[in-house]
Amino acid sequence: IEREQERVKEAKENIKRVGVEDKIHIYEGDAVEILPTLNEKYDAIFIDAAKGKYPFFLKESLRMIQPDGIIFADNILYKGYVMSDYNKHKQRTAVRNLREYIKQVSENPNLETKILEVGDGLAVSRIKN
């Protein structure tokens, strides 16, 4: 799901170039609006969107992921703010919701989660069978 038209175009070109257009579908629009309308099951879901919406994206991802599927959440440490006490007012909501995401994936007995401290952080959650 991508809302920026230029990125949609680039993604479609890349998908076609590697010959997987029959396996990948790009939805153009706002993920908050599109996700609730999807009923398919997916092997993998990659979240890289509005940081303040990560708990919502997790809820929707858990609904759509296959058993043994993997959910990736990019930028989970958000410039180091998630792991520090200091948060600029501008980032408070995003940081609070990223912390909530980490709490949810860490405490969910149906998930095995690792937080990778590479770049801006990546959460990798595998659905247990």
State what each model feature region is.
Residues 1-129:
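S-adenosylmethionine/decaboxylated-SAM
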